[in-house]
C-alpha cells in the first residue's frame, strides 16, 4: 500500500501550514526508509540506493536525537505512532 506524502504530513503536522517540523521530517524519512528497504530486498546489488538508505537512516537518527533532547513526550508519542524502537 502506497502512502502519499501529503497524508503523512497531515497525520503528523502541528498546525495547518506545518510541512517542515521535526515530527513531519521524521515521518517522511521513515516512509522513504521503508520504501528503500523493500527496493533493496528485491535489488540486492543496488549499492547507490543502499548508500541513500544509510544517509536517510542517519538523518532520521539525528532528528530523533534532537527531538528527544527538546521534547521527550513528543518523542515518545512519535516513536509509538511510527512503530520505531526507542
UniProtKB/Swiss-Prot annotation:
<dbReference type="InterPro" id="IPR000589">
    <property type="entry name" value="Ribosomal_uS15"/>
</dbReference>
<comment type="function">
    <text>One of the primary rRNA binding proteins, it binds directly to 16S rRNA where it helps nucleate assembly of the platform of the 30S subunit by binding and bridging several RNA helices of the 16S rRNA.</text>
</comment>
<dbReference type="GO" id="GO:0022627">
    <property type="term" value="C:cytosolic small ribosomal subunit"/>
</dbReference>
<protein>
    <recommendedName>
        <fullName>Small ribosomal subunit protein uS15</fullName>
    </recommendedName>
</protein>
<keyword id="KW-0699">rRNA-binding</keyword>
<dbReference type="InterPro" id="IPR005290">
    <property type="entry name" value="Ribosomal_uS15_bac-type"/>
</dbReference>
<keyword id="KW-0694">RNA-binding</keyword>
<comment type="subunit">
    <text>Part of the 30S ribosomal subunit. Forms a bridge to the 50S subunit in the 70S ribosome, contacting the 23S rRNA.</text>
</comment>
<keyword id="KW-0689">Ribosomal protein</keyword>
<dbReference type="GO" id="GO:0006412">
    <property type="term" value="P:translation"/>
</dbReference>
<dbReference type="InterPro" id="IPR009068">
    <property type="entry name" value="uS15_NS1_RNA-bd_sf"/>
</dbReference>
<comment type="function">
    <text>Forms an intersubunit bridge (bridge B4) with the 23S rRNA of the 50S subunit in the ribosome.</text>
</comment>
<dbReference type="Pfam" id="PF00312">
    <property type="entry name" value="Ribosomal_S15"/>
</dbReference>
<dbReference type="GO" id="GO:0003735">
    <property type="term" value="F:structural constituent of ribosome"/>
</dbReference>
<keyword id="KW-0687">Ribonucleoprotein</keyword>
<comment type="similarity">
    <text>Belongs to the universal ribosomal protein uS15 family.</text>
</comment>
<dbReference type="GO" id="GO:0019843">
    <property type="term" value="F:rRNA binding"/>
</dbReference>
